[in-house]
Amino acid sequence: MIYTTTETIPGRDIIEIVGVVTGNVVQSKHIGRDIMAGLKSIVGGEIRGYTEMLSDARDVAINRLVASAAQKGADAIVGIRFTTSAIMDGSSEIMAFGTAVKLGPSR
């Protein structure tokens, strides 16, 4: 499966738009990370525990996005974007979305 943030794929024509596909995950914060994050915010700097958590969550969202497109018979996903939002206190959602397409042969 080809997936990209661009609207086109070099050397390939989009022959059919399958539709919008999404992949999301809601990730809760770990109480230990929350305590360390609070301390880190006092002195400044990167909160690595949260950075790792969001990176892992983004990977899950991408995997779900690709699975959704494959289930619909797509060859690729173009125009991928990400959103992040707070769902409730202590948890965040990461959503990946894009357009599932079918591709013609290589030019």
From Swiss-Prot:
Matches recorded under SUPFAM superfamilies: YbjQ-like
Origin: domain of life: Bacteria
Gene3D superfamilies per record: Hypothetical protein apc22750. Chain B
Family: Belongs to the UPF0145 family.
Name the record gives this protein: UPF0145 protein Sfri_2095
